[in-house]
Curated annotation (Swiss-Prot):
The modification N6-(pyridoxal phosphate)lysine is found at K233. Acts as a beta-cystathionase and as a repressor of the maltose regulon. GO terms for molecular function: cysteine-S-conjugate beta-lyase activity; DNA-binding transcription factor binding; L-cysteine desulfhydrase activity; protein homodimerization activity; pyridoxal phosphate binding. Disulfide bonds: none annotated. Pfam families: Aminotran_1_2. GO terms for biological process: methionine biosynthetic process. The gene is malY. Gene3D superfamilies: Aspartate Aminotransferase, domain 1, Type I PLP-dependent aspartate aminotransferase-like (Major domain). This is Protein MalY. The lineage of its organism: Bacteria, Pseudomonadati, Pseudomonadota, Gammaproteobacteria, Enterobacterales. It catalyses: L,L-cystathionine + H2O = L-homocysteine + pyruvate + NH4(+); an S-substituted L-cysteine + H2O = a thiol + pyruvate + NH4(+).
Length: 390
């Protein structure tokens, strides 16, 4: 019904992954598996809705607080995550990272600390340090059956007086960990006990395929908190901009909206972003179901090929995200030598693990959100590069 094997040429579309790969990797003639967007066209229902809106021809100022947008969000949380939300607590933002940054500014002072689980999405470091706050890392531990947080170590950090916020990535990027209900309950209890506010970035919430379902932070939340997300990852529409969140505390919500509108002048959203989200959340579930099957098969392909080439890896697909977080430490290869071989010999761009913090050394992050034909070339290039530097 949906053909994810179709190759779409993204060159010349001002595309970060393809047109600007040289910015990060130094050369343009690379096959990229980098930034976390996909090479697939978005859902047909979204394209149809956008076409209809474009035919209207008038693109004046718009407002996010409308019944259709709020109802679509409520419908999605109800049908996909079995969670009821109060539409009065929903807020808009131009991006999840903008919302993260704004709440960091509001909920902490210069020099105070923000807890993150590491390895961590690189934009988290930038949002924290760019606001003159201090990163307080808590390293996830890799075990035979997945990634885990030592809750004792987490509490030791949360208990420090300078710690004001826990910035949670749920599901976690780059490891693909899906937090269990017990883990979320423990973290909620610890944050409440130590007066730490919680910002939960749940932008990958729809990309889950393991036995553990995604559980929204709102299901366990206590105290002051915000759940931030978007349809941009799920439906491959980040260039349309637009995100949303849930802030239950009315004072915190009002303060956020005041900054969004008054100080930053960002409260009028892209009407195409609204149109796309409404179509996605009301009609896009069948497309997303098919996409998840394709992406899981892609990740399984990576596991089969990498484990056949290097049995000592025994790599298992992640619980979530289309990002293969590959632990190459058993191969004892040099990160920089591998990157050099990937770029110069294989002409492939794959994110080095140290992009996501010191705990990422020895890993690479390979974006599997692409047609299989492209993925085959990337995995072959990675295998060849590893063999060249061993």
């Amino acid at each position: 019904m949906f053909d994810f094997s179709k190759v779409v040429d993204r060159h010349g579309t001002w595309c970060t992954q393809w047109d600007y790969v040289a910015d990060r990797f130094g050369t343009a003639d690379l096959l990229p598996f980098t930034i976390s967007d996909m090479d697939f066209a978005t859902a047909p229902c979204i394209i149809e809705a956008l076409n209809q809106r474009l035919m209207h021809g008038v693109f004046g100022y718009s407002r996010w607080k409308n019944d259709e947008f709020l109802a679509a969000i409520a419908h999605w949380f109800s049908t996909q995550h079995y969670t009821a939300i109060d539409s009065q607590t929903v807020v808009y933002g131009p991006s999840v990272i903008y919302m993260v940054s704004e709440l960091i500014r509001q909920w902490s002072e210069t020099g105070e600390g923000v807890v993150i689980h590491t390895p961590a999405y690189d934009a988290f470091y930038k949002a924290i340090e760019g606001n003159q706050r201090t990163v307080m890392p808590v390293a996830l531990e890799k075990q035979a059956d997945g990634w885990f947080c030592d809750m004792g170590k987490l509490e030791a950090v949360l208990a420090k007086p300078e710690c004001k916020i826990m910035l949670l990535c749920s599901p976690q990027n780059p490891t693909g960990k899906v937090w269990t209900c017990d883990e979320l309950e423990i973290m909620a209890d610890l944050c409440e006990r130590h007066g730490v506010r919680v910002i939960s970035d749940e932008i990958h919430m729809d990309m889950v395929w393991g036995e553990q379902p995604h559980i929204p932070w709102s299901n366990v939340a206590r105290g002051d908190w915000a759940l931030l997300t978007s349809g941009s990852k799920s439906f491959n529409i980040p260039a349309l901009t637009g995100a949303y969140g849930i802030i239950e505390n009315s004072s915190s919500r009002d303060a956020y909206l005041s900054a969004l509108k008054g100080r930053d002048g960002l409260s009028s959203p892209s009407v195409l972003a609204l149109t796309a989200h409404i179509a996605a959340y009301q009609q896009g579930a069948p497309w997303l179901d098919a996409l998840r099957i394709y992406l899981k098969d892609n990740l399984t392909y990576i596991a089969d090929k990498m484990n056949a080439a290097f049995p000592e890896l025994n790599w298992q697909i992640p619980q979530s995200t289309y990002l293969a977080w590959l632990d190459l430490r058993p191969l004892n290869i040099d990160d920089n030598a591998l990157q050099k071989a990937l770029i110069e010999q294989e002409k492939v761009a794959i994110m080095p693990g140290y992009t996501y913090g010191e705990e990422g050394r020895g890993f690479v992050r390979l974006n599997a959100g692409c047609p299989r034909s492209k993925l085959e070339k990337g995995v072959a290039g990675l295998i060849n590069a590893i063999r060249a530097v061993r």
